[in-house]
Amino acid sequence: MRCEILSVGTELLLGDILNTNSQYLSRRLAELGIPVYFHTTVGDNPERLKKALEIAFSRSDMVIATGGLGPTQDDLTKEVSAEFFNKKLVLHEESLKRIKEFFEKRGLALTEGNIKQAYIVEGSRVIPNDWGTAPGIILEEGNKILILLPGPPKEMIPMFETYVVPYLLSFSSGIIHSRVLRVCGIGESFMEEKVKDLIKTQTNPTIAPYAKEGEAILRVTARADTKEEAEKMIERVVEEIRKRLGDYIYGEGETSLEEVVVDLLSKKSLTISIAESCTGGLISARLVNVPGVSKFFKGSLVAYDNEIKIRELNVPREIIEKYGAVSSQCAMKMAEGVAQKMGTDIGLSATGIAGPEGGTPEKPVGLVYIGLYIRGELSYKELRLSGDRNRIRLYTTINALDFLRRGLLNL
């Protein structure tokens, strides 16, 4: 099978951004035994994009195109692809639902451009985008295959690894099996550095790292004659990865961080209450996602105002006056106060500056403190986060749950 990589985007032609997608795809396709014969880059121009598709399919069996799936008027890869194959664009309801949920979760307004992203080429199969808004597609037409993926690497790479790789491997003989390790508490780059040599030397199984909203993921994939053989191959690699990453790995597969936390609370027969300031109830909402959590989670209090922290959580006024509401001292007192108020074994708290206003040189936007009280023992974690208000609140929530998880593991 001859493959061509088609990169779409005027910014690539102008040199405004580096085309890392082509490099990544070429390397991974080579590892999968699929030769890449051509690389083409074309701007956001419908006539030139259509011509690029004509040339590509005149010499290749499969074209993987990245970019041009965004919400703006010059994102036309799907439209041109539909025209090239003489097909219509049709609304994919499940993709529209995912996009709406993506925006609602972040408190953002949905635009017509975003709705446009839910349209797919008639007769194609959808590549779900769990990392952004634009779904990809796989279109088989005769003996030709077109695969469309978003341009942002943080979306393209995990979509390729999660959905496209199994599709491509289906053309080869044998069994394909994967395991996903979920990592929290370290960034994607730090995690990758820890296992860099394994990634470079492994061809079967392969190891693919990528990020997903405050956590990192490692997908280990093996090809073998039987599922049992593939599992054995994967287990050897997973065992080595676990030695290097330790309890940064919180789970496997589709296990969520909150599910792991609730499972630990259950095993240790502990109850918890939560005091939130900058997160405004997000931590509690994550825990409540887990069925059966009511046995362990007794309640929460959103103490946004300093007077509420003092009156309801018994945070000493002198602590706020001396150290401020955004401080380790305040966070720990909030955690202790909510545990005592609700009579729980554990108290968890979060206080910080989510922005966009409120920051100072000493305490910038993104400074967050997480407090933890476990049966009389107090601890805290300081975070220095970046991004907009919603991102800071989301990452605080994830870090708070992970800090709690680690506290429970140490009991």
From Swiss-Prot:
SMART domains: MoCF_biosynth. SUPFAM superfamilies: CinA-like, Molybdenum cofactor biosynthesis proteins. InterPro entries: CinA, CinA-like_C, CinA_C, CinA_KH, Competence-induced_CinA, MoaB/Mog-like_dom_sf, MoaB/Mog_dom. HAMAP family: CinA_B (MF_00226_B). Belongs to the CinA family. This is CinA-like protein. The lineage of its organism: Bacteria, Pseudomonadati, Dictyoglomota, Dictyoglomia, Dictyoglomales.
